[in-house]
A protein has these predicted regions:
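Two-component histidine kinase catalytic core, primarily the HATPase_c
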Residues: 35
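Phosphopantetheine carrier-protein modules
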Residues: 10-30, 48-57, 81
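C-terminal structural segments of small proteins and small subunits
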Residues: 54-56, 61-78
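Short, conserved alpha-helical segments within structured domains
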Residues: 1, 21, 60-63
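Thiotemplate assembly-line natural product biosynthesis machinery
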Residues: 1-18, 69-81
Length: 81
């Protein structure tokens, strides 16, 4: 799942290396609120889910791990890839 998230993030913002662990994507300026909205659309399509608007919070997008946890809570399919 994390590899797929990194691929989506890299397509959205190719100028950043999302493979570095432990980064706060928001605080490092790697994604902003506009990116979060675009990311939600991509994640919904990729994982066959619908992320609830109340879950579009910076803490849910602060890291690849946080995004993965959000996907699991949202019922993401095929979470092992």
């Amino acid at each position: 799942m994390k590899e797929r998230i990194i691929k989506i993030l890299s397509e959205l913002r190719p100028e950043f290396d999302f493979t570095v662990e432990g980064l706060d994507l928001i605080e490092e300026g790697m994604i902003d609120s506009f990116d979060m909205v675009s990311l939600v659309n991509e994640l919904d399509t990729e994982f066959g889910i619908s992320i609830d608007g109340v879950d579009i919070l910076p803490e849910n997008f602060a890291s690849v791990e946080a995004i993965a946890n959000l996907l699991i809570r949202s019922g993401a399919k095929d979470v092992t890839k």
